[in-house]
Swiss-Prot record:
It is a multi-pass membrane protein. The modification Phosphohistidine is found at H557. This is Lactose permease. The keyword Transmembrane applies. It is found in: Cell membrane. Responsible for transport of beta-galactosides into the cell, with the concomitant uptake of protons (symport system), and also for transport of homologous and heterologous exchange of beta-galactosides. One of its GO terms (biological process) is sodium ion transport. InterPro entries: Dup_hybrid_motif, MFS_2, MFS_trans_sf, Na/Gal_symport, Na/Gal_symport_CS, PTS_EIIA_1_perm. The PTS EIIA type-1 domain may serve a regulatory function, through its phosphorylation activity. The chain crosses the membrane at residues 20-40, 59-79, 99-119, 124-144, 176-196, 207-227, 264-284, 294-314, 322-342, 347-367, 398-418, 433-453. It comes from Leuconostoc lactis. Its EC number is 2.7.1.-. The lineage of its organism: Bacteria, Bacillati, Bacillota, Bacilli, Lactobacillales. The keyword Iron-sulfur does not apply. Keywords: Cell membrane, Kinase, Membrane, Phosphoprotein, Plasmid, Sugar transport, Symport, Transferase, Transmembrane, Transmembrane helix, Transport.
Length: 639
């Protein structure tokens, strides 16, 4: 049989990957324009020509409205997700919303970057009403595009490795779109302002031109996804997935203290990062007096981002996540000292920017949150995969909303609004700017470090211990399910792989007890042993829980010691909740890599509620073929 792990990407798959990656180039650039530079436009050009006192009141009003609307986005996202999920068209469910969302939000972005055609100069009350309606619509259609873009990954590929590549490529181009915007914003706004007025500055006409450029890129990127990818009507898309509400998220956080502390540490880090990132334009323009060199901030962020992402897995082989998080936070803390004490020296600022962007926080937080799933399962019997997936995006939206509010408040308080220049900003206003832009985020970054070191207990070693203890608990049947109805059922088990069948106590190094069997596999493929569904997967990918259509619950564990590989070499061909048929491919694993790391590759299958099993009939130990009937169980089904 051909080892499926050795398949190479076809030309069509490569086109799909490139098309999908291009989608986030414009999508991320659009988000950058909306979340960061729209507020810059509001404070500097939207109310150009109005008395400063009136302009500041309108800036405050718009800033408050943006914060409220962005916070409301957290609540409506699940609703939009349901709408996308229930869409059925000849083009699929995701691509129509990707294109519609991009086109509508892009048109509305251009409209609000005109100052709604100068309506504020005519009637500011009418302006506030129209702006609120337009911004809500813009935010909704942007969210449609966002939900559709990331939601379509399982529709493109059934292979977890491929899905990981799609996601990584999307994140890569997203970084280019986000940081590339920082590099072009000043040249583009200056160019279009010069074309319209003959002045070398960032005026309203320049911001209008900037919005057109961003909108065109966003629409073209969405079209690349629509025409370059193909949605598949596969089992993964039809997996039964429960929608996660905001109530579910907060409930999951409250009942799992590690999710709580990891989330709080990330919230502090994210607040520091987004606030400082949001005011860097003002820093270059009003403190340094060098707006034309603002592109350096984007260039540094791009280079450092490209370096730290591939560097993380290499460093993590020798350095723990907690240490890597600490290194990143210490670098961020030092960066603020360079910004504060070297604010007039471009070299010092450059060093500060390098340190500011040298962080592993997002990677560490994602992995730590993922590991907290097994912690919660061991602690209270609840797995919160959906909650964990929703936590970081929710926190990003919350911090993004507050960032918009803080940036607007900082600009007004420090007098960095309207046609003000660096020469108009007094020393006292610069001090005010520093308090909010640097000292306050410095405090947030210190709190993030303290919380993570003091309260976060999920390390790689601790997680390995939790997984081992959890498997022992599951195999012994220590945690009993709640019984609402009990039926006696019969289930036939078919070999999930070809190889030598063994008893559990015949596997060297196996500490699992209970009822089950093991197979020394001939190949690195794992197939479904009966008709049923995937209940859950450990974050280390080497263990999955399955349940038959008759209610028989089992754990399939690949390898002894493979928990230490942290998922390397394991590729799943399903998502949690997916229904499968006997003989469907569930997983591929690299036998050579497992052996190279000094571990065994035995496939162990055991049943998690042995107290409910009435009778077990197994064939004798011998070489079996995948799909061959090897056991028959009579059990009490709790459903």
């Amino acid at each position: 049989m051909k080892d499926i792990t050795k398949q190479k990407f076809s030309r069509n798959k490569l086109v799909e990957m490139i098309s999908f990656a291009l989608g986030n180039l414009g999508h991320a650039a659009f988000y950058g324009a909306l979340s960061t530079y729209f507020i810059v436009y509001v404070t500097s050009g939207m109310f150009d020509g109005l008395p400063q006192s009136v302009a500041n009141k309108l800036i405050g009003l718009i800033t408050a409205l943006v914060v409220i609307i962005r916070l409301a986005e957290v609540i409506i996202d699940p609703i939009l997700g349901n709408i996308v999920d229930n869409t059925k068209t000849r083009w699929g469910k995701f691509k129509p919303w990707q294109v519609i969302g991009a086109v509508v939000s892009s048109v509305l972005l251009v409209v609000i970057f005109t100052g709604i055609f100068g309506l504020a100069h005519i009637n500011w009350i009418a302006f506030a009403i129209v702006f609120t309606v337009l911004f809500i619509l813009l935010d909704i259609f942007y969210s449609f595009a966002d939900v559709a873009y990331w939601g379509m990954v399982p529709a493109i590929s059934e292979d977890s490795k491929e899905r990981g590549i799609f996601t990584s490529l999307g994140s890569f181009t997203g970084s280019i779109g986000w940081n590339g915007l920082t590099m072009i914003v000043v040249p583009v706004t200056t160019y279009f302002t010069f074309i319209a007025t003959g002045k070398h500055e960032q005026g309203p006409s320049g911001w209008f031109g900037f919005s057109i450029v961003v909108s065109i890129v966003a629409v073209l990127s969405a079209l690349a996804v629509a025409f370059g990818t193909k949605e598949k009507d596969n089992l993964i898309r039809n997996a039964a997935t429960k929608k996660t509400s905001i109530k579910d998220v907060f409930s999951g956080i409250i009942h799992n203290d590690q999710i709580l502390w990891i989330s709080l540490a990330y919230l502090m880090y994210s607040l520091a990062y987004v606030v400082t990132n949001g005011v860097l334009f003002y820093f270059f323009k009003f403190v340094l007096g060098k707006p034309n060199e603002f592109w350096i901030a984007g260039a540094i962020a791009t280079v450092i981002g490209f370096s730290t992402a591939p560097l993380y897995p290499v460093l993590n082989k020798f350095i723990t996540r907690k240490v890597l998080f600490s290194i990143g936070q210490m670098a961020m803390i030092l960066s603020y000292l360079f910004f504060i004490f070297g604010k007039t020296n471009m070299m010092m600022v450059t060093i500060g920017l390098i340190l500011f962007n040298f962080t592993f926080a997002q990677l560490v937080v994602v992995l730590s949150l993922t590991d907290s799933i097994e912690y919660g399962q061991l602690k209270n019997g609840n797995r919160n995969e959906a909650v964990v997936l929703a936590v970081r995006p929710m926190l990003d939206k919350i911090t993004g909303a507050f960032s918009n509010g803080l940036v607007g408040a900082i600009a007004i308080t420090a007098g960095m609004t309207g046609s003000a220049t660096a020469g108009d900003i007094s020393a006292s206003k610069i001090n005010t700017f520093e308090i909010y832009a640097f000292y306050t985020p410095l405090l947030f970054s210190i709190l993030a470090l303290v919380i993570f070191l003091w309260k976060v207990k999920i390390t790689e070693k601790k997680h390995a211990e939790i997984v081992i203890e959890l498997e022992k608990t599951l195999s012994s049947g220590a945690k009993k399910a709640n019984t609402s109805e009990v039926n006696v059922e019969l289930e036939e088990i078919f070999a999930p792989a070809s190889g030598q069948k063994k008893l559990l106590n015949e596997v060297d190094g196996n500490t699992l007890t209970g009822i089950g069997f093991a197979i020394d596999p001939e190949e690195g493929n794992l197939f479904a042993p009966f008709d049923g569904k995937v209940d859950f997967t450990f974050s280390t990918k080497h263990v999955l829980g399955v349940v038959s259509n008759n209610g028989l619950k089992a754990i399939i564990h690949v390898g002894i010691g493979t928990i230490n590989m942290r998922g390397a070499g394991f590729v799943s061909h399903y998502v949690d909740g997916q229904l499968f048929k006997k003989g469907d491919l569930l997983m591929t694993f690299d036998k050579k890599l497992i052996t190279k790391n000094g571990y065994q590759d035995d496939i162990i299958m055991y049943f998690t509620q042995p107290e409910n099993i009435i009778d077990v009939q197994q064939i004798d130990n011998r070489v079996v073929k995948q799909g061959e009937k090897i056991a028959k169980l009579t059990f009490r089904s709790e459903r």
